[in-house]
Amino acid sequence: MAFLQDGNHTAVTEFILLGLTDDPVLRVVLFTIILCIYLVTVFGNLSTILLIRVSSQLHHPMYFFLSHLASVDIGISSSVTPSMLVNFLLERSTISYLGCGIQLGSADFIASVECFLLAAMAYDRFMAVCNPLLYSTKMSTQVCVQLVVGSYIGGFLNASLIVTVYFFSFLFCGPNRIDHFFCDFAPLAELSCSDVSVSVLIISFSAGSVTMITVFVIVISYSYILITILKMHSTEGRHKAFSTCTSHLTAVTLYYGTITFIYVMPKSSFSTDQNKVVSVFYMVMIPMLNPLIYSLSNNEIKGALKRQLGMKTLS
């Protein structure tokens, strides 16, 4: 039952996810591609986590943050990809009202945590390049744990605001067809028959605050890093400093670039289908790419992987 009579209102009890396409052939093709991407995402990020855990030479703050980023990437992909895959197999994919709220909250929680983690990683790079003598003191285990815990708390608070205060206060009494492959705030706000203008404003402010604060930390950190690198006289030192920052800058550019497209640019400037494609890149592709970005340009990770594979071969 999709609707429930409640006094003078008809409340929606489930939503229909329209997904990416109605074309049966294209659905099969997309199912195969996205399933492969998801499996690579889980395998790649789990491998990163395990490699960091078992390799003593990777027991440094940068890799501590990277292991949590890998966990978050598995989470953000898992929050939407399984339901998307089911959507490809069914002619009519539905999600309950409660399930929609949980999916919205989990996706927002994990996305917010990733923003804070990327900012923490930028600060870690700043300390490593600009204050190498104080690095071990300033980036102690206690400080790293506090930054990670703070990232999760910040993500939880942001998600709680969106889900608890606003989603469950929305009244859905009309159409229940979401033109997306997951429960996102914008299409849900369009379906609500209650006044959501204030809610949209506050949620935009909340999401914008997370983005602006973390971007500010990243920009300031890399501004100081760039100044420090330009002052270096050693070519080898410059190359090493650049190499340690390149992978993180690439990940930051991809992540915040898609966030800007989805949540900052005016909705009139792109279609719903374009929004879906960018959302797939943001929630499905980037979690798969991050392990490749961080491992291909990192000699320590490649060295640790070779040592572990060598040990397995010898044993």
From Swiss-Prot:
Disulfide bonds join 100-193. GO terms for biological process: G protein-coupled receptor signaling pathway; sensory perception of smell. InterPro entries: GPCR_Rhodpsn (IPR000276), GPCR_Rhodpsn_7TM (IPR017452), Olfact_rcpt (IPR000725). Glycans are attached at residue 8. The chain crosses the membrane at residues 29-49, 58-78, 103-123, 137-157, 201-221, 242-262, 276-296. One of its GO terms (cellular component) is membrane. The keyword Transcription does not apply. It is found in: Cell membrane. One of its GO terms (molecular function) is G protein-coupled receptor activity. PROSITE patterns: G_PROTEIN_RECEP_F1_1, G_PROTEIN_RECEP_F1_2. Gene3D superfamilies: Rhodopsin 7-helix transmembrane proteins. Residues 50-57, 124-136, 222-241, 297-315 are cytoplasmic. Its main location: membrane. Residues 1-28, 79-102, 158-200, 263-275 are extracellular. Keywords: Cell membrane, Disulfide bond, G-protein coupled receptor, Glycoprotein, Membrane, Olfaction, Receptor, Sensory transduction, Transducer, Transmembrane, Transmembrane helix. It is a multi-pass membrane protein. It comes from the Eukaryota. Belongs to the G-protein coupled receptor 1 family. Potential odorant receptor. This is Olfactory receptor 5P59. It comes from Mus musculus (Mouse). The gene is Or5p59.
